[in-house]
Swiss-Prot record:
This is F-box protein PP2-A15. It comes from the Eukaryota. Pfam families: F-box-like (PF12937), PP2 (PF14299). Residues 17-63 form the F-box domain. GO terms for molecular function: carbohydrate binding. SUPFAM superfamilies: F-box domain. Disulfide bonds: none annotated. Transmembrane segments: none annotated. CDD domains: F-box_AtSKIP3-like (cd22162).
């Protein structure tokens, strides 16, 4: 059994077993790797010399990088990526790259190679953020940006943001990351406080997004309804929740796409408070052709 596995991997136990994986030309292995994900390629790299060589090939990793990868590299100092192989460039870009005064981050997904983005609460416009009677900035390790905006109490609740970026063609979703209640650490344990959490069960919060080419999406959510949530087994208080606003399509005809978003509850008949705003995420969810195909099938 051990002899057979050795021959399968190396093709060097040459008495009678015939060709093995080690006899496959590196160029052929590279062609197969074009259809595999980066984690799959890395897992197979240890099989033998041909697989290891193909797993480091620039031609393989060039296909895994997004078409705008040079735009991402331009956000870094040249010495970070100068003379790197395409595989190493992929590794660099799969880690978050901060920009816009470190209030935004962009990176590529390690499996799909598609571009993802996050925007901190500090990178958005928040009504009343300068007044500590309404808002406070709370440092925390629970945010990728290490700080969240905490609302104590306000009547006019509005959070807006915008970003312009060269996104590769594809279908993207936008979502807000929100937390009901204030959280702290006590004796190493996470403790949540809800004394100021109120007003989110009276009227829904309206979420919206729009793009520079005219796409729009909107939705409404009640952020807090303790009795209903408990009945359904959905516990929102004390947890980070991602509220999906909608989808938009980038066709690639424009050099860059501007995305605008907002989260509002501006009914001033009641106050609301006890809410943490962390960030907005823009994530790829598919390619344009597949999206159009599903739309056609749905209409049929």
């Amino acid at each position: 059994m051990g002899s057979s596995l050795s021959n399968l991997n190396d093709g060097t136990n040459g008495l009678a077993m015939g060709p093995g994986l080690g006899d496959i030309p590196e160029s052929c292995v590279a062609c197969v790797f074009m259809y595999l994900t980066p984690p799959e390629i890395c897992n197979l790299a240890g099989l033998n010399r041909s697989f290891r060589g193909a797993a480091s090939s620039d031609s393989v990793w060039e296909k895994k990088l997004p078409e705008n990868y040079q735009d991402l590299l331009d956000l870094l100092p040249p010495e970070r990526y100068h003379s790197l192989s395409k595989k190493d460039i992929f590794a660099v870009l799969s880690r978050p790259i901060p920009f816009d005064d470190d209030n935004k981050e962009v990176w590529i997904d390690r499996v799909t190679g598609r571009v993802c983005m996050a925007i901190s609460a500090r990178g958005m416009s928040i009504t009343g953020i300068e007044d500590r009677r309404y808002w406070n900035w709370i440092p925390t390790e629970e945010s990728r940006f290490h700080v969240v905006a905490y609302l104590q109490q306000i009547w006019w609740f509005e959070v807006d943001g915008t970003v312009r970026f060269h996104l590769p063609p594809g279908v993207y979703s936008l979502s807000f990351r929100i937390h009901l209640g204030r959280f702290t650490k006590r004796l190493g344990r996470r403790v949540c406080h809800f004394e100021l959490t109120h007003g989110w069960d009276l009227k829904p919060v309206r979420f919206s997004l729009s793009t520079s080419d005219g796409q729009e999406a909107s939705c409404e959510y009640y952020l807090d309804d303790v009795e209903r949530n408990e009945a359904l087994g959905k516990h929102k208080r004390g947890y980070w929740i991602e509220y999906r606003v909608g989808e938009f399509i980038v066709n690639g005809s424009e050099p860059s796409t501007e995305i605008q978003w907002s989260m509002k509850q501006i009914d001033c008949t009641h106050s609301k408070g006890g809410l943490c705003v962390d960030s907005v995420f823009i994530n790829p969810i598919g390619d344009v052709k597949e999206h159009k195909r599903k739309a056609v099938l749905k209409e049929a």
